[in-house]
Design a protein with these regions (language model features):
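Expand to "…catalyze enediolate/carbanion chemistry for C-C bond making/breaking, isomerization
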Residues: 1-204
Length: 204
């Protein structure tokens, strides 16, 4: 870690601005993923390299079944617990990437999000729009969950931890999910702003 910081300074990289994306490539790495994440405070994201992992455990990649349900799930949970982003894509595109229609790509990206993953590395520009759509909460979702937070706060103030709203029962787990949706929307907006600033700086 000390050597990395010195190298970064020597290369003109401002301290605290370097982010590391880890790729888990072996059976041992899956088993020790928490330890690997903890090796540097600069680790920001971690994902499976499913092609190398296939070789490590002697698996032939086939579209008919997903051999990495456990590995992907463990990585997602361990990364989230460590406060870094788990990234990756639902089977079979992790080992057998290919071009898909916009709708098909949106489904795969949505499946990936629902596996606990927080982003996807896009090897082709055609993936980007569908991936962004899948991982970004819609305005209606943000509006709904903002109302959920308001309604739940009022319920807590009134002395109850469960209240009906819009045909649903709002309780602590729903309020916690509302926090996640709103925080994700805020993070996506911030990243879009950062990208726009970078594009403007590059074209100046």
């Amino acid at each position: 870690e000390v050597g990395r910081k010195c190298a970064a300074r020597g290369g003109g990289i401002e301290q605290g601005t370097l982010s590391i994306l880890l790729r888990v490539e072996s059976a041992e790495a899956v088993f020790r993923v928490t330890e690997i994440i903890a090796a540097s405070e600069s680790v920001a994201q971690v994902g499976l390299d499913e092609s190398d992992l296939s070789a490590s455990v002697g698996i032939s990649s086939l579209s008919e079944y997903d051999p990495f349900v456990y590995a992907r799930g463990r990585m997602a949970i361990e990364a989230t617990a460590a406060g870094v982003q788990p990234i990756g894509i639902a089977h079979p595109l992790g080992t057998l990437p290919r071009l898909l229609s916009g709708d098909d790509m949106l489904k795969v990206a949505t499946d990936s999000k629902n596996l606990g993953l927080k982003g996807i590395i896009c090897p082709h520009p055609s993936w980007v729009s569908s991936v962004n759509t899948a991982f970004t909460p819609t305005e209606s979702q943000v509006d709904f969950y903002t109302q959920v937070r308001d309604v739940f706060a009022q319920a807590i103030a009134a002395g109850t931890a469960a209240v009906p709203f819009a045909g649903r029962m709002i309780d602590v787990p729903v309020d916690e999910w509302a926090k996640v949706v709103i925080a994700t929307s805020t993070a996506c907006s911030l990243r879009d702003s950062e990208k726009q600033t970078a594009l403007e700086a590059a074209s100046a």
